[in-house]
């Protein structure tokens, strides 16, 4: 129904535009048509379905050698252990787990942080489960170098990149491998679920922003097999794609500065140049979102700057006839129209005469669009979130639209003019951990009756991107004891 409704609406806009070119009708018809077309992803996102496999395809996937890489830097030790435990507990056993400590150090005392207890437990547990586990410590050079320290020469078939404070659902790896039944698929994005969705008003707002993106914009891109950015929280890659760019990926530069952000979009672009990139909504990982404005502001600016810089790479390397080229162009056009259209309306006396009706039309359309997007909340059901919570999120979805317009849009413009700050990544000065109350187990259900379950017990770890200090937040904790290549990436 969303697709049919969008088609009817598009025809109406096209007719209005044709009439306007005859000298009659609304002089802004073309601008409204373009604005409408930029919402292409909303109806398309409803066409995404989790990829499934036949018995024969599953046997082939079961033969793949899977390597999980976990970079670590000044990590909260209990959170790191929870992350590794979630990898051990996968229904589809992985073959290798490669942990790389990127020179963790306590800056207050200038002494190395080596995680001796967790390292010993990890290596012993890996041996007991007959999984090849390694734990290396390197000089601090950043996440990309930590990843390629082991992946450049790893002989695996599939590489899984996982943040060290993420918690995998038990079926995450099994589900994430299924799209690789298609030999043209080069990378798979996991589905990121907000864990601390009800902590405060900000996390509720971010939940309204995250879910429509992961199950909206990214889902629409997946239908086209052109997911532009995998989440660094959880992503799967054909190993040859990553190995082919060793030495280039970790040394990317922009305006002579090393790129310390958007590593995930770089790997995704490599995959897009070699084949298809998709999203698997049933491969679920739980993550934490900021609980303070300062944390959220700095995280958003970092992402926006990195994405804007990556736009230059997309437009340079993506085929001009493909969706990978035009999607970032559409994003820039949408940003431009958000500034130009209001100015044009104010400058046109004819439009000013109908200002009240025009404003009401815009408001009604915005409400409809935001509510249509918000219906994606019902695509993921959790037993730690009552149905009433999702109903309220849908009803309040227009607030997210206002947030995008009056908060994120100005931030995006500022990020564009300060995009040269790509090397500001910071370092953690300390690790601060506190326990939170225990909860019962939580489950996540998808429309096709896929149910995922994780134990939810206290933990504390969320990194502030400016101070790099950890914040006290609840995250799950187990109850058990404890191929195309191109020039090196520089843009002057």
Feature-to-residue mapping (PLM):
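N-terminal membrane-anchoring/stem segments of glycan-assembly enzymes
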Residues: 1-62, 404-419, 464, 468, ...
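Short hydrophobic helices that act as membrane-entry/anchoring signals
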Residues: 5, 16, 203, 207-218, ...
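Membrane-embedded multi-pass helical conduit in multi-pass membrane proteins
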Residues: 11-34, 58-60, 328-421
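Non-transmembrane catalytic domains and loops of membrane-associated enzymes and transporters
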Residues: 58-321, 492
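Cytosolic juxtamembrane regulatory segments of multi-pass membrane proteins
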Residues: 64-77, 399-413, 432-454
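Hydrophobic alpha-helical transmembrane segments and immediately flanking/interface helices
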Residues: 97-106, 424-444
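Alpha-helical membrane-protein architecture signal
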Residues: 293, 297, 322-326, 395, ...
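Serine/threonine-rich intrinsically disordered cytosolic regulatory regions enriched
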Residues: 448-490
């Amino acid at each position: 129904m969303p697709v049919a409704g969008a088609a009817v609406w598009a025809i109406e806009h096209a007719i209005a535009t044709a009439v306007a070119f005859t000298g009659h009708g609304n002089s802004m018809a073309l601008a409204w048509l373009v604005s409408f077309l930029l919402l292409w992803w909303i109806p398309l996102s409803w066409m995404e379905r989790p990829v499934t496999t036949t018995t024969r395809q599953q046997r082939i996937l079961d033969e793949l050698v899977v390597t999980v890489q976990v970079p670590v830097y000044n990590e909260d030790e209990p959170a790191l252990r929870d992350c590794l435990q979630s990898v051990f507990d996968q229904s589809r056993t992985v073959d290798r787990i490669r942990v790389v400590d990127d020179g963790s150090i306590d800056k207050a005392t200038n002494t190395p942080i080596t995680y001796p207890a967790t390292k010993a437990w990890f290596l012993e547990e890996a041996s007991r489960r007959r999984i090849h586990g390694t734990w290396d410590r390197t000089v601090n050079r950043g996440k990309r170098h930590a990843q390629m320290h082991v992946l450049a020469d790893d002989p695996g078939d599939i590489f899984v990149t996982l943040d060290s404070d993420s918690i995998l659902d038990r079926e995450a790896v099994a589900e994430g491998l299924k799209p690789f039944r298609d030999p043209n698929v080069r990378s798979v994005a996991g589905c990121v679920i907000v864990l601390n969705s009800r902590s405060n008003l900000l996390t509720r707002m971010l939940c309204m922003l995250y879910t429509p993106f992961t199950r909206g914009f990214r889902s629409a891109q997946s239908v086209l097999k052109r997911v532009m950015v995998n989440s660094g929280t959880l992503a799967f890659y054909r190993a040859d794609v990553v190995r082919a760019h060793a030495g280039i990926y970790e040394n990317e530069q922009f305006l002579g500065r090393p790129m310390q952000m958007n590593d995930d979009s770089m790997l995704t672009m490599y995959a897009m140049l070699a084949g298809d990139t998709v999203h698997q909504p049933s491969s679920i990982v739980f993550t934490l979102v900021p609980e303070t404005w300062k944390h959220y502001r700095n995280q958003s600016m970092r992402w926006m700057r990195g994405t804007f810089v990556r736009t230059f790479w997309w437009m340079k390397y993506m085929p001009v006839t493909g969706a990978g080229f035009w999607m970032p162009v559409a994003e820039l056009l949408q940003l431009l129209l958000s500034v130009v259209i209001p100015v044009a309306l104010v400058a046109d006396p004819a439009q000013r005469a109908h200002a009240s009706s025009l404003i009401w039309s815009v408001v009604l359309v915005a409400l409809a669009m935001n509510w249509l997007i918000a219906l994606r909340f019902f695509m993921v059901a959790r037993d730690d979130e009552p149905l009433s919570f999702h109903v309220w999120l849908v009803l309040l979805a227009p607030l997210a639209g206002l947030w995008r317009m009056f908060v994120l849009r100005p931030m995006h413009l500022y990020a564009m003019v300060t995009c040269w700050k790509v090397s500001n990544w910071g370092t953690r000065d300390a690790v601060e951990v506190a326990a939170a109350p225990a909860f019962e187990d939580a489950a996540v259900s998808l429309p096709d009756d896929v149910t995922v379950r994780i134990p939810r017990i206290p933990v504390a770890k969320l990194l502030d991107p400016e101070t790099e200090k950890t914040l006290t937040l609840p995250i799950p904790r187990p109850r058990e004891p404890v191929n195309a290549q191109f020039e090196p990436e520089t843009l002057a």
